[in-house]
Amino acid sequence: MDIGDVIQDLERIAPPDRAEEMDTGRIGLIIEGRRDIRKVACALDVTLPVVRAAAAMDAGLLVVHHTPLWTPVTAVSGPLAALLRQILSADLNVYVMHTNFDHAEGGINDALASLLELSGTGRMSLGICGDCPLTLPEIARRLSAPLITWGRPSLPCRIGVVGGSGFDLPLIEEAAALGAEAFLSADLKHAQARASPLPLLQSTHYALESPGMRMLAGRMGWEFIDDPPVTAVWT
C-alpha cells in the first residue's frame, strides 16, 4: 500500500484536528522513508530497540504516540544521531499520533478505561470517569507496573483516568464533579498532590499509554513492539 493511502487511514483513526495546540508540527509523518508499505509496526516511543525491532521485521512504517523530535533540533549528534541513523538506514517512515489519539474514540484513554473495566463512563475534556470494579492490587496487575497512592483511596470506587501526564488540577476537579472518588494518571508533582481534592493513584507513563497502542496494533493487524522502562519501588 502507498504511504499516502496509509496516512489517510491513520488520520481517520486519530484526526489531526483533534490534537492540542502543543502538538503543532509534532504529529503526522515526521520522518519519511519508503513509499510502498507492506508491514506496519507500532510502539509507544521511538527508541533504538524499537527501531531495530521494526527494521528486523522489515516494517515500512512505525506508528508511535510520542515524537522523538519534541524540542527544536539545533544539532544532530549523540543519541539522536544514532537513532536517526538507524531510522534512515532502514528506510523507515515514522508517524506520530499524540493528543489527537488521546482524544480519539478507541484511543489512549478509551483503551485504559477498557483495561480497567470502567462502567457508567463519562468523558472529561481529557480522560474518562467511570466506576472501577478493581482493587488497588488488581489495578497494578492490570497495568503491569507499580502503583503509588496519595491520600486514602478506597477501591473499588468511581475514578477518573487520564493516560500520560494528567495530574492537572482542573482535570482532577472535573473528575470530582463527575462523581470520581479517586484519580489515576502519571508524572505527579508535589504541588499537584497537595492541591488535589481527590486521593490520587500514580502509575508510570508507559503503563497508562502503551495499552492504547497495543490495542490499536491488534485492531489493525500491526506488530506491537513493547519496550517498557525498567521500574522498581524500594521501601
Feature map (PLM): residue ranges:
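Active-site catalytic microenvironments in core metabolic enzymes, especially phosphate/sugar-handling
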Residues: 1-235
